């Protein structure tokens, strides 16, 4: 009965052959034996080659340099505006201002600062005159019997250096001493100094006070040389200074 059962895989009349050929692992002589292409190029090498190609392009390099310069320029501008905001009054520093708002607030604040500087300079002049007048009056009272002592302190001059090219000069003299203040101004201007401003006042102690804001055109102000020059100008008018 078993012999009548047909095989599971019929050969349809073809010989089955040797099955040992398919059971072996040696397929070196088959049609599958062909060389594979070399695909070992890495991503890094490709990227490096692309970057080298871009850097060799003058248009790309110009664009990269422009972008770098623009970033640096914006960084400097932001730093300058940040410094400008820090100079504004505290009420304007509570919130971050835009560029246009910062410039607007600065333009409004500059005249206020200029007015404050004028008031402070005026106050300084008044204090300097008061101190100089008190010192001279005390010396005059103590030496009222000595005419030479009174004469030697009849007039005084002092200078305050404001900057490398500017100086404030204060002159104190007795009203009884006759000297032309215009002669002093003329002599100073002949020496290359520019008169920025001048003022005068009178105290209760019979003294006159003059203030001159001078600026030199070329070079720096030398306080000692300026004092000697004023001393010479006043000596021409019959004054002596200490």
Curated annotation (Swiss-Prot):
Expressed constitutively in roots, leaves, and stems. Induction: Up regulated by iron deficiency in roots and leaves, as well as by nickel, high zinc or high copper treatments. Repressed by heat treatment, high iron, low copper and low zinc treatments. Residues 61-113 form the bHLH domain. Keywords: DNA-binding, Nucleus, Transcription, Transcription regulation. The gene is BHLH100. SUPFAM superfamilies: HLH, helix-loop-helix DNA-binding domain. Plays a role in metal homeostasis. Confers tolerance to high zinc (Zn) and nickel (Ni). This is Transcription factor bHLH100. Pfam families: HLH. The keyword Iron does not apply. It comes from Arabidopsis thaliana. Gene3D superfamilies: Helix-loop-helix DNA-binding domain (4.10.280.10). It is found in: Nucleus. One of its GO terms (molecular function) is protein dimerization activity. Homodimer. The keyword Nucleus applies. GO terms for cellular component: nucleus. GO terms for biological process: cellular response to iron ion starvation; regulation of DNA-templated transcription; regulation of transcription by RNA polymerase II; response to water deprivation.
């Amino acid at each position: 009965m078993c012999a009548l059962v047909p095989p599971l895989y019929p050969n349809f009349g073809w010989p089955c052959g040797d099955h040992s050929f398919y059971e072996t692992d040696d397929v070196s002589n088959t049609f599958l034996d062909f060389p594979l292409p070399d695909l070992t190029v890495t991503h890094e090498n490709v990227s490096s080659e692309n970057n080298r190609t871009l850097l060799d392009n003058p248009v790309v390099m110009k664009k990269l340099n422009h972008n770098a310069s623009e970033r640096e320029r914006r960084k400097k501008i932001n730093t300058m505006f940040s410094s400008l905001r820090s100079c504004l009054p505290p009420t304007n520093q509570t919130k971050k201002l835009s560029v246009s708002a910062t410039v607007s607030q600065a333009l409004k604040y500059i005249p206020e600062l200029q007015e404050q500087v004028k008031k402070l300079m005026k106050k300084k002049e008044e204090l300097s005159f008061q101190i100089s007048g008190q010192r001279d009056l005390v010396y005059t009272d103590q030496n009222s019997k000595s005419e030479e002592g009174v004469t030697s302190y009849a007039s005084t001059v002092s200078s305050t250096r404001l900057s490398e090219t500017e100086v404030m000069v204060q002159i104190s003299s007795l009203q009884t001493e006759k000297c032309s203040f215009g002669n002093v101004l003329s002599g100073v201007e002949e020496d290359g100094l520019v008169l920025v401003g001048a003022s005068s006042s009178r105290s209760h102690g019979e003294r006159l006070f003059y203030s001159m804001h001078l600026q030199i055109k070329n070079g720096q102000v030398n306080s000692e040389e300026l004092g000697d020059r004023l001393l010479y100008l006043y000596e021409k008018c019959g004054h002596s200074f200490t």
